[in-house]
């Protein structure tokens, strides 16, 4: 598996498909001593000279940047009659190239159409095909008229314009009313809605099945086969999801991930079908009374209505599996091409890896991808042009690579101007990639387009024209835990006038569930920090003065002293890792301390050498980053004590890192005595809640817990 991409890097590494993961070294930079071994070692056993740069991003033949250039978008026709005339005239033109014909087996109920890859790249006939044709998109208009279109789902906003203005005014002034409550299953709910001075907004009542939802008939026929009885959590959240509330769900687990994935896929499919049917119905109305000046505002600037942001290609495959089982299409164009380029087999050597690791990195773990989907009455088309697509599935890096160009004239993000439902799944995994890409994408949602792209402005909704689309957009975020970065997204980008929900679990505490045969002392050292900006500096000063000095004194006894080796220093931030590593390598205070360093950029060879030296005692200490553990899940042997420069974001990592103390049964008693010491400040409140538990008050002084039975003691 390739090394992960570093924070702040835009194009440093793509976790690509297996067999194509190369390395490139950082050129033109002097080597830096990243480790120190005992002086009696030979030259060949020294630490790593320089950290390896992550490999370059592979170019994607299936969805290159050119595939999504704005200049090749399809042009919408004002009238279906004109569209048919254009098609007829094109077919009569013998001078131009003949239109491509696709052979379809009409005897089969489901047909997969394979389109050659070059046809996806600037095929003028394909790009200029009309959006609506009698053959594939016009459904029974009587059925369309019979179905009610909900107010939040592409309805006529004219009657609610005054209410919308009041809500937007309240949101702009940060006027939110929040209500907190407890949910069954140890969950906490916070519901916020705009404070307009009117009556309190109530959440919709829980439902117990799909029969309570207004689904399109095409979806209702098959959804019940895959989404059966709701549990208490799903029954409470489903009405809010289908009611177009914003949702931040901070309790995603392996057991509930598939259920919520099916639920939001059903929701976005229902939204796309209802939106399309309203357009078809209004098209019919305008044809029946062509002389009347009808106010039919039912569209956005561009066609894409749904954006789903995912961490890996394999996660995209899982979403497509949910979509295809809910939306039964007779034809699936480029399905084989999709699975060939997006899916892969799991690595058999990962049998001992944790379940959450295998879910995230199993299969194709490439994090640079994008996919357009177009839905018609009979067909799902993979790899459709963005401006022809109803739905876009992509990673943050994949989107940014097509949006952010060095040449400002080539920058293109107009396809995000009319997104009505935005979804982030596995947001905690995106934090370990590069969260800045997520912020960049959301900062470009629902902006006024630079070009018209064939838009019929007489049909564009008023809130798009007024630049208010972000207040009507629904945003759903699913994460295993909530961090300050995710909270910032919740506060700044989730501005839905319908209101927003935040779901968080009640944590028992990771300190109570350790995989150790004996109790272990766990000490939490709090340091003063005046602000989040000054926190790194305050943490470093506390570490060098209060923690590092005793460590250096214990290491002066040399290799013969058992207490002189086996210290693992866990560092969550890569920037803090670089600072501590440089200090250990250059400071006179640590000139007698032998150490190794493993980060997410360390080469495989240097990782193996550092682990060997640490286990043998030639390295007294080993620096180890959280992102390294996230991407690798190493089992570090030889650990006798753990110093946590900061507590991990992921509470699962606490048990895994502390569990290193028990990997050597012979030294378990000594390791338990060495124990764990973790540094924290008041700005680590969210992380500390997951570690010590929701009901435990965050300690104000040095504190330790023993493993079994759980006890609590304050050290004066």
Curated annotation (Swiss-Prot):
One of its GO terms (biological process) is maturation of SSU-rRNA from tricistronic rRNA transcript (SSU-rRNA, 5.8S rRNA, LSU-rRNA). Residues 1-17 have a biased composition (Low complexity). It comes from the Eukaryota. Residues 18-27 have a biased composition (Basic residues). The keyword Ribosomal protein does not apply. Its main location: nucleus. InterPro entries: P-loop_NTPase (IPR027417), UTP25 (IPR010678), UTP25_C (IPR053939), UTP25_NTPase-like (IPR053940). Keywords: Nucleus, Ribonucleoprotein, Ribosome biogenesis, rRNA processing. It is found in: Nucleus, Nucleolus. One of its GO terms (molecular function) is U3 snoRNA binding. PANTHER family: ORF PROTEIN-RELATED (PTHR12933), U3 SMALL NUCLEOLAR RNA-ASSOCIATED PROTEIN 25 HOMOLOG (PTHR12933:SF0). DEAD-box RNA helicase-like protein required for pre-18S rRNA processing, specifically at sites A0, A1, and A2. This is U3 small nucleolar RNA-associated protein 25. The gene is UTP25.
